[in-house]
């Protein structure tokens, strides 16, 4: 295992890369479609119908490219989460295993965002054109996106963000405290194994709630929706644990108010 002087910078570099990628992902999924950053090609009249688009190589080629990028990201994200791969990376990278996973995921997502090919000439599933929808629908989408991202950031902070990013593992190792997950209860570990993406509903809102849903955005939303759905396996025990934890936190938050009332 590398000395602490090397572990800490490596974990911080992974965190900075992930943070920058997260900011770029907000721009890619929200700011660009909501603020008109996707290049147009003559407006709605220049778009083809669905049957014509499915026979047009100039539309199918970028869609196939985008699909390849998404499969690359999903493949990396799933492969490195497999138990055998995690055991191998833990053997050679130790406490940096999670940081390595986060860094590779960020790099794969960077590839998706940087080389994504829009399809402005393709058909759209829906589009807000006529007034007042052309004004109010983008505004409503913007508000929902802002709320969703605020919820995402709040949930990540509550859901042991430092452990998810790999920082806590290195911090505990340097202080000789062992593995962070080893200190959690069996019910918490069970929940974490079922729910490593604790922001599913909010991400789905960001992916689907847009003023214009074109072919490339539809591909992005569909594939990530399927992946998020398959990555979640909550059952009744998990829900009971979440409900108990929520009630416990609310009880703790209400204690100062009870003291003041007395």
Curated annotation (Swiss-Prot):
Keywords of this entry: Membrane, Nucleus, Transmembrane, Transmembrane helix
Family statement drawn from the similarity comment of this UniProt entry: Belongs to the nurim family.
Segments passing through the bilayer: 5-28, 59-80, 98-114, 134-164, 192-210, 217-234
Membrane topology, Nuclear segments: 1-4, 81-97, 165-191, 235-262
Alphabetical list of InterPro entries matching this protein: Nurim-like (IPR033580)
Oxidoreductase among keywords: no
Compartments, record wording: Nucleus inner membrane
Perinuclear space side: 29-58, 115-133, 211-216
Lineage of producing organism: Eukaryota, Metazoa, Chordata, Craniata, Vertebrata
Membrane topology category: Multi-pass membrane protein
Organism, scientific name: Macaca mulatta (Rhesus macaque)
Full protein name: Nurim
Gene Ontology cellular-component terms listed: nuclear envelope; nuclear inner membrane; nuclear membrane
């Amino acid at each position: 295992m590398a000395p602490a002087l090397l572990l800490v910078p490596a974990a911080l570099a992974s965190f900075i890369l992930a943070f920058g990628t997260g900011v770029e992902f907000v721009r890619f999924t929200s700011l660009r479609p909501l603020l008109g950053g996707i290049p147009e090609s003559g407006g709605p009249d220049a778009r083809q119908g669905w049957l014509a688009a499915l026979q047009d190589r100039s539309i199918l080629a970028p869609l196939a490219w985008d699909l390849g990028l998404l499969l690359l990201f999903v493949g990396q994200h799933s492969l490195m989460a497999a138990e055998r791969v995690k055991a191998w990376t833990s053997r050679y990278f130790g406490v940096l295993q999670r940081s390595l996973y986060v860094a590779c995921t960020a790099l794969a997502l960077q590839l998706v965002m940087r080389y994504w090919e829009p399809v402005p000439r393709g058909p759209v599933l829906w589009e807000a054109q006529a007034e007042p929808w052309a004004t109010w629908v983008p505004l409503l989408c913007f508000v929902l996106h802002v709320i969703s991202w605020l919820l995402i950031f709040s949930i990540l902070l509550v859901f042991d963000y430092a452990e998810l990013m790999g920082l806590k593992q290195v911090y505990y190792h340097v202080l000789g405290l062992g593995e962070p997950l080893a200190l959690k209860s069996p019910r918490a570990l069970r929940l974490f194994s079922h729910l490593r993406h604790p922001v599913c509903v909010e991400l789905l809102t960001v992916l689907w709630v847009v003023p214009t849903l074109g072919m490339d955005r539809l591909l992005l939303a569909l594939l990530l929706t399927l992946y998020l759905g398959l990555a979640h396996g909550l059952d009744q025990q998990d829900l009971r644990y979440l409900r108990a934890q929520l009630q416990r936190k609310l009880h703790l938050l209400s204690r100062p108010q009870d003291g003041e009332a007395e």
